[in-house]
Amino acid sequence: AEVLAEVRGQVGFITLNRAKALNALSLGMVRDLLDVLLQWQKDEKVLAVAIRGNGKEGAFGAFCAGGDIRFLHKAGSTGNPEIEDFFTEEYALNHLIHTLGKPYIAFMDGIVMGGGMGISQGGTARIVTERTKMAMPETIIGLFPDVGGGYFLSRCPGRVGEWLALTGDTINGASAIAANLADGFMPSDKQAGVWEQLGTEKFADGAAVQKFIESQYV
């Protein structure tokens, strides 16, 4: 499956499992993510959600390279109505993450671009590593910074958001924190341990999960 979801302890865990495509989001993946998040939003036993992307080397290393451009190009050139479904449902997913009402912890290791920003920027704990490569490259393919970019890029200090939007430039984890596009830094080799601990700790409530994660930032 391209989206792996399980509940361990009091936390719902999502792994994007399409490493060959750097976890680019297909329509099926968007639908899987919507389904599981709506389910967990209603489930009182799930206090928080954590999400990561499988990389070629293992459980972390590539968060999400964005929307599946190959699919979008093919759908667009053949008049496939699924292209509209993709954007409509992807944007609904982005909005859901912003309004989830529970801590949403994004392990933004490796590539975090375009649609990958859309499924992380609405989170309450946006964690970057020394391997993070972040960008909103939509203008390069003649689109605009979508997936909520108008919201999160406008909240960068000064004119940084405008610069990121117009150039599509890639920034690292430290710059992401400075630009208000990430909340904390974690060395990549520490992620697996924290991910495991999220599923074994006892938490009083969602706020306690959020507090635990923030205590792990370097």
Where are these regions (language model features)?
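Glycine-rich beta-to-alpha active-site loop
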Residues: 97-141, 163-164, 168-173
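Hydrophobic, secondary-structure "cap" segments at the distal end of domains
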Residues: 150-159
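Gly/Pro- and small hydrophobic-enriched strand-loop and loop-to-helix capping segments
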Residues: 123-146, 180-195
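Amphipathic alpha-helical blocks and their helix-capping loop/short-beta junctions
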Residues: 187-218
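Conserved CoA-thioester-binding segment of acyl-CoA-metabolizing enzymes
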Residues: 1-52
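Hydrophobic/aromatic residues within transmembrane alpha-helices
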Residues: 14, 51, 68, 119-120, ...
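Catalytic-core regions built around general acid/base machinery
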Residues: 36, 89-100
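Glycine- (often His-adjacent) and acidic-residue-rich active-site loop
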Residues: 53-92, 140-142
